UniProtKB/Swiss-Prot annotation:
Activated by phosphorylation. Catalyzes the conversion of glucosamine-6-phosphate to glucosamine-1-phosphate. Gene3D superfamilies: Alpha-D-Glucose-1,6-Bisphosphate, subunit A, domain 3, Alpha-D-phosphohexomutase, C-terminal domain. CDD domains: GlmM. The lineage of its organism: Bacteria, Pseudomonadati, Pseudomonadota, Alphaproteobacteria, Rhodobacterales. Mg(2+) binds at S102, D241, D243, D245. Belongs to the phosphohexose mutase family. The gene is glmM. It catalyses: alpha-D-glucosamine 1-phosphate = D-glucosamine 6-phosphate. This is Phosphoglucosamine mutase. Keywords: Isomerase, Magnesium, Metal-binding, Phosphoprotein.
Length: 449
């Protein structure tokens, strides 16, 4: 059997391997077996989902698999991914499951898991679960089948946790906030939380129909929110993705700020207050060199990891760091959450606005980014373009052209069949030529796929 787990659980197109109802049933049974190894009858799991049409299918299939092995299932309905991590801990569950493909289109879906501590499962745990899927799992006796129950107040519990992360002496009165929920899991939670804190809320992307998640809106399409900010004269825009674990911020002029600018702001503010653990920020290899230079000038360190918020979190836990994230908008603040939380990060930015009395355009302009270019090349199943001699030669030549004054990063996506080619260099022309040469070689290697 091919490897199921990628960098963020199991993901693919709905009704195609591995994202079929049959496979979800097998995954549920294997996970149930894994967490019932000690034979206890008290094990429970919480399941959340985003707003994709296929979410109902996978919710039922997973529930069937889990209960067939004696697990008791608590169904949260549509909630953000970070809410699942939170409620797994607060409801004393052994496992949390989120059904979502995050920022991907509605035709995709995915399944990701959280352990009893609210953090994503380790690679070792996923490997053991895959082995159980391959070998098959026996169902329990009829009297030992687990129960399934819907939990109606999950989103309200999450809203209360969000509000406790916001300074108690502060309100958002007078702030006009555009919140783009990507027609996803936060379409009710986010506007409600902002309204309860006193903001004037302009909600967009809050009309999910099962097929429009991330469609022309949310963190992958921030221009929609940017246009709304300008049209309404708003102070700031907050763009979430389909499961609300990432955020992109918009200033009052409509300019888009990425995760690097937000992390720079929070690292600076936390360091000034003695709150930044180990005076360091954890980010991935995709974060801009400008961020690294900015932190260095402040006497702070940048710890880089592989791409994926799970690797950021693993490094944070191993090194005792409390702030990390990705340029794409996954922001992890372990003082408040166990995983990337777009809405939590957005609230921390609003707190910075109210405390500093500075506009978003100032707060999101911490450093001048080094020019960066990212291009993707799609490949077909079974192809290994990075092993092609032509591609290796093009990469070596491009690295030589950058002459140690920039960066070249080539990697396969962990969630899609893409080769990502990224370069940074102060000379735009040199950077573009380096990327073009590698992209051309990869495209040739895959036959223009």
């Amino acid at each position: 059997m091919d490897k199921l787990f990628g960098t963020d659980g199991v993901r693919g197109k709905a009704n195609e391997h591995p994202m079929t109802a049959e496979m979800a049933l097998r995954i549920g049974a294997a996970v149930g077996k894994y967490f019932r190894r000690d034979g206890s009858a008290a094990h429970r799991v919480v399941i959340g989902k985003d707003t994709r049409l296929s979410g109902y299918m996978f919710e039922n299939a997973l529930t069937a698999g889990l209960t067939s092995t004696g697990m008791n299932v608590l169904l949260l309905g549509p909630v953000p991914t970070p809410a699942v991590g939170l409620l797994t801990r607060s409801m004393r569950a052994d496992l949390g499951v989120m059904i979502s493909a995050s920022h991907n289109p509605a035709c995709d879906n995915g399944i990701k898991f959280f352990g009893p501590d609210g953090f994503k499962l380790s690679d070792q745990a996923e490997e053991e679960i895959e082995a159980l899927i391959a070998s098959g799992v026996d169902a329990v006796e009829a009297n030992d089948i687990g129960r399934a129950k819907r939990i109606d107040d999950g989103r309200f519990r999450y809203i209360e946790r969000l509000k406790t992360s916001f300074p108690r002496q502060r309100r958002l009165d007078g702030l006009k906030v555009v919140i783009d929920c990507a027609n996803g899991a936060a379409h009710r939670v986010a506007p409600e939380a902002l309204w309860e804190l006193g903001a004037t809320v302009i909600p967009v992307g809050v009309s999910p129909n099962g097929k429009n998640i991330n469609e022309g809106c949310g963190s992958t399409h921030p221009q929609f929110a940017a246009d709304t900010v300008v049209a309404h004269g708003a102070d700031v825009g907050i763009c979430l993705d389909g499961d609300a674990d990432r955020v992109i911020l918009i200033d009052e002029t409509g300019k888009v700020g990425d995760g690097d600018q937000f992390m720079a702001l929070m690292a600076q503010r936390w360091a000034e207050r003695g709150k930044l653990a180990n005076n360091a920020l954890v980010a991935t290899v995709m974060s801009n060199l400008g961020l690294e230079h900015f932190l260095s000038d402040l006497g702070l360190k940048l710890e880089r990891t592989a791409v994926g918020d799970r690797y950021v979190v693993e490094r944070m836990r191993a090194g005792g760091f409390n702030l990390g994230g990705e340029q794409s908008g996954h922001i992890v603040m372990t003082d408040y959450a166990t995983t990337g939380d777009g809405l939590m990060a957005g609230l921390q930015f609003l707190a910075a606005m109210t405390q500093s009395e500075q506009p978003a355009s100032v707060l999101l302009n911490r450093f001048e980014p080094v020019p960066q270019l990212l291009r993707n090349v799609r490949f077909a199943a079974g192809q290994t373009p990075l092993e092609d001699a032509r591609v290796k030669a093009a990469i070596a030549a491009a690295e030589a052209d950058l002459s140690g004054k920039g960066r070249l990063l080539i990697r396969k996506s962990g969630t899609e069949p893409l080769v990502r080619v990224m370069a940074e260099h102060e000379d735009q022309t040199v950077m573009e030529q380096a990327v073009d040469s590698v992209v051309e070689a990869v495209a040739d290697a895959v036959g223009g796929t």
